[in-house]
Each structure stands twice: as structure tokens, then as C-alpha cells.
Amino acid sequence: MRLCDTDIERYLDDGIISLTPRPNNDKINGATIDVRLGNSFRVFREHSAPFIDLSGPKEEVSAQLESVMSDEIIIPEGEAFFLHPGTLALATTLESVKLPANIIGWLDGRSSLARLGLMVHVTAHRIDPGWEGKIVLEFYNSGKLPLALRPNMVIGALSFEVLSGEAKRPYSIRKDAKYKNQQSAVASRIDEDKE
């Protein structure tokens, strides 16, 4: 069952779901709560690698990823990050999210931004039960013009569903949880996948 605005408010008030900093109640709409853009970004550097072999030896995949991904870029308050057409970038939500083992979250982009060509999450919009940390956004500009993205702007909305029971393996206790407690735009850790 997806939570309605009344339940989202109650779950936040009771500490069942946590968003830090907590958005004002006027950011809770029907069945979602707005989340804002943080100030941490990563982009792909100019590179000459013809491809990344995602199924290659872990050491090679790790080296290839390291060679193409930038260090963390922090955008100061009031300044903009420019996402150019055809470009992929990673960013974070301003809010850190904490979910219990019986609730799953979903991130959706804003229709108004999508109409300008901005994809807020390329494919990864599920927030696992037991998640704790900021949400990394996979931005892609499929439009024709550069887009100026500023920290604190509303970037998407979260919705929540109560599971049929408590997850046996919530994200918070999984030993293979690669992005546990992330607070910045963490690059892909596909090289840490188990065989």
C-alpha cells in the first residue's frame, strides 16, 4: 500500500521514516514528498577509453572507472551546475533518507523538468527497505539546451510503500551493500559486485 500525505506526515512525526533536513509539510503532496538537490556532483572526464568492459576482471573495471569519473565537485550555495545536452552526471539529494525494514521508497523526477529533457534517475529509482543515506541521482540531459541546476531546488519526489512484512535482508544489514550511508555523489561500484 502506497502511503498518502496524511500517513507520510505521521510516519515522519513518529520517526518511522526520516528525512534530514525534514521538508516542511507543504512539500508533502497527495502521495509524495518533494526532495531537493544537494551540492555534490560527479561527471565523466574527457577520456580516450573506447569502452568499459563491465564483465572484465574487477581490477581492470575499477581502474577504468577511476580513469573516467571525476572527483567530487561541490557547488557553492547560489551557484549553478550546468548539465549540457547528451551529458550524464551524478548528484545527491539534499536530504538524507532513512527507511525501516518494512518500507520501500520510490524516487520520481518532476514532470516540469522532464519536459525540458532532464532525467533525474536514469534507471535506479528504488530506495531499498533499510536504506540510510542521501540518494544519488543519475542526471541525463536529453534536451537541446544546457540546464542550470542549483543546490536546494526541488528535483524530485519520494513515495513510500509498506511491504507485506519486514524484509529479512534490509539494505542496512547486508554485507554486500555498496552504497550504505552514502553522503556524496558516489561513483559506480559495479566492480564490487559479487560473482
From Swiss-Prot:
Keyword Magnesium present in the record's keywords: the answer is no
In its UniProt record, which GO terms are filed under biological process?
A: dUMP biosynthetic process; dUTP biosynthetic process; nucleobase-containing small molecule interconversion
Q: In which pathway does it act?
A: Pyrimidine metabolism; dUMP biosynthesis; dUMP from dCTP (dUTP route): step 1/2
Provide the residue positions that the database annotates as binding dCTP: 110-115, 128, 136-138, 171, 178, 182
What are the record keywords, sorted? Hydrolase, Nucleotide metabolism, Nucleotide-binding
Superkingdom of origin organism: Bacteria
Query: Transmembrane region positions?
Result: none
* Subunit-structure text: Homotrimer.
Family of this protein: Belongs to the dCTP deaminase family.
* Name of the molecule in the record: dCTP deaminase
Instruction: Give the gene name.
Output: dcd
